[in-house]
Amino acid sequence: MVSNHPKALKVLFFTEMWERMSYYGMRGILVLFMTASIQDGGLDFSNSSASAIYGIYAAAVYLATLPGGWIADNLYGQQKTVLYGGIIIMFGHLILAIPNMSLFYFGLTLVVIGTGLLKPNISALVGGLYENKIDMRESGFTIFYMSINLGSILGFFICGYLGENIGWHYGFGAAGIGMLFGVIQYIL
């Protein structure tokens, strides 16, 4: 039963849900945006160039979790690192929402850095909630994992719809707003 779990699980659940909404929402439209023609608001990259950029981006996100964990352990602590990561992700998505090619790679880089800070540490915070409740840890992580699935579904629908039907930058903007909701919810 959810009521038996620590109250902080709810905060971490919704923070992760909004972060995953922003992450998967942006990822869902990224290659489409890069390969769309300039007349359609895209970057007019070839499929191979867009796929290469996407692959480098995806790999960088996962590699960034290593320094993100180190930064939390040695500099700021997990709670502050999650907050800083969320703010950086939000700005990365909002920069992607600006129709300016020169800002494109900067926005992607911010999302990589922010995700590297947030992702490993929010999971560690969930684990820390159950230091004295080992028997509940598995169900706590199951509940937390549902936030990832829920956020990804929201992201694909919201950012995907806006990106393909209204404009790519609206999809990226929605990802930024989603992360803003996550940051606000985390600090309240």
Summary of predicted features, one role per range:
Residues 61, 136-164, 170-182, 186:
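Glycine-rich segments within core transmembrane alpha-helices of 12-TM secondary carriers
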Residues 34-35, 71-73, 158-167:
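Interfacial helix-cap and linker-helix signal at transmembrane-aqueous boundaries
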Residues 74-86, 133:
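Cytoplasmic membrane-interface "Motif A"-like loop-to-helix N-cap segments
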Residues 117-131:
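Intracellular juxtamembrane helix-capping segments at the cytosolic ends
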Residues 51-73, 119, 153:
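Central cavity-lining transmembrane alpha-helices of secondary-active solute carriers
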Residues 28-49:
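Short amphipathic helix-loop junctions that connect adjacent transmembrane helices
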Residues 1-24, 29:
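Cytosolic juxtamembrane N-terminal segment immediately preceding the first transmembrane helix
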Residues 84-105:
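C-terminal ends and interior cores of transmembrane alpha-helices
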